[in-house]
Amino acid sequence: VLNRVIDFMLSYSQSNLNPEEIVLKEIFEEILNDYSHIFDQENIKVDSSFPVQLKLTINKQFFRDILQNLIDNSIKAMANAKTKILKVSYEALSNNLVIKVSDTGVGIPVERREQVFALYYTTTQDKGGAGVGLYIVKTRVESLKGTVSIEDSEFGEIGTTVKIVIPFKN
């Protein structure tokens, strides 16, 4: 955890120094591939939807940090779930990139949905959570002029959906 905080602080200080053009589908697939052994080991079914080939000029490491932290959280949240499904998608709406990461984990009660973005707030301490991941997601998304929110789960009564909206120019 300390290493993640230090890495975060170092890369944050370099924030927008290195924006580069990325192909979203490639980044999403690369990150999901990085986790494939964990998905197999934990018996997690991955449902991904990347319907459009979209290029974005953005800090690549910030973008990776966002996705990796959301996936890490989903894996922890599904540790004791009977059905383990991770759904990752993006779409372009107007001049916004809308990313959704959903899981069939324990879920987040409505009254705690704002709290989870605070530094050191965790509901998964017993699974190694330190309350840093969603804080990193929030600060990274905000540095990209975007918003992040917790929505009702796409899976009904179980799980969580995190929605990120990042503006871009066509």
Ranges and model annotations:
Residues D40, K45-K55:
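Conserved catalytic submotifs in the C-terminal HATPase_c
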Residues G146-T147:
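Conserved glycine-rich
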Residues Q61, Q68-N73:
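Conserved polar catalytic motif of the HATPase_c/GHKL fold
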Residues D103:
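Acidic ATP/Mg2+-coordinating residue in the GHKL
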Residues V141-E142:
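Detector for a conserved hydrophobic position within an alpha-helical segment of the HATPase_c
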Residues I108-Y120:
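Short conserved segment of the HATPase_c
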Residues V1-I38:
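Conserved DHp (HisKA) dimerization/phosphotransfer helix of two-component histidine kinases, i.e.
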Residues T83-N95:
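Short beta-strand/loop element within the Bergerat-fold HATPase_c
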